[in-house]
């Protein structure tokens, strides 16, 4: 890349939007990767509140940004302004990745793709399997990959109703699929579901930081 390590008049712009984003390691990770791969892109983080999402996406088109990642609390709001949604994003009603194709914004929900891909890399297929998920992350991806049944355990908080809505969308998207949502505090039920499952996935934040 000409002018390696420097921003030029041709440098493409990508970003992370959400709030707060000051702690994010994404800019360092992506910019390091771009430099190593010789890609003329720069990645920055913008602190965007929910009420600013539409304006941010309009600016994304205006400045011909190639795309962006979306973090909390903007994922659901951003989905409202997409020109097109991937199947998983449509089911969940939220996006964490947006691609700008000549002004057409395409929203994706990639949570779960790494999980499913890692299983496949280790010779484990999702198709036809029963899966129990703590936290709900990746549920749509697992279903769209052919899982026959999924049990989701979530905390009964503000997001529990949204999980129930997601389960209903999954049933409509994939007729015949079995999807159940339970309170994660019901340890007896969780034990029962795990014992009858082929795969158990922890999609909560527990384990992301040292205890």
Q: What do these predicted regions represent?
A:
Residues 147-174:
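NAD(P)-binding Rossmann-fold cofactor-contacting core
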Residues 2-124:
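Phosphate/diphosphate ligand-binding glycine-rich loop within oxidoreductases
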